[in-house]
Amino acid sequence: MKLNKLALVLGLGLSVVAGSALAADQGHGTVKFVGSIIDAPCSITPDTENQTVPLGQISTAALKDGGRSNSRDFKISLENCTTETYKTVQTTFTGSEATEVLEGSLGIEGIAKNAAVVITDAGGKQIKLGTPSAAQNLRDGNNDLNFAAYLQGSASEAAVPGDFTAIATFALTYQ
């Protein structure tokens, strides 16, 4: 009888250990939290801090003789803004300039050639690289800074088909 009880206890103990071992390997992972603290009256939302704006597949016919694609809207969203000290914000875009296409435009890299990305304000006015946008009023809470971009063809050379990328960085200046 003692032997049966001992076997029962050992059997139960082994099943608990075996079950725990199986349960421990049913999935695991890591959650990494990243960010930065900035000295500014607004926070930039994570989904608009680094973004991709798809310009689409643009025909060479649309870019002929300095033609352009349709504009694609994008925005930089600010949250938790306070206007105690600063009332406006300007945005400055920088990147590799394509002066041969249009002064202040963003050069493209890749197989495609003879075109450039033009960044505009919400009203369609070009924001030249390295030049601050017009000041936009801030309000307490959340704010969207609205922009657009399009692909501009060269007026002197035919656009070369192929994939391209163009990367601009932005900096905000509060007044």
Swiss-Prot record:
GO terms for cellular component: pilus. Keywords: Disulfide bond, Fimbrium, Signal. Disulfide bonds join C42-C81. Residues 1-23 form the signal peptide. It is found in: Fimbrium. Its main location: other. It comes from the Bacteria. GO terms for biological process: cell adhesion involved in single-species biofilm formation. InterPro entries: Adhesion_dom_fimbrial, Adhesion_dom_fimbrial_sf, Adhesion_dom_sf, Bact_Fimbrial_Adh_Pro. Belongs to the fimbrial protein family. Major structural component of mannose-resistant/proteus-like fimbriae of P.mirabilis. This is Major MR/P fimbria protein. The gene is mrpA.
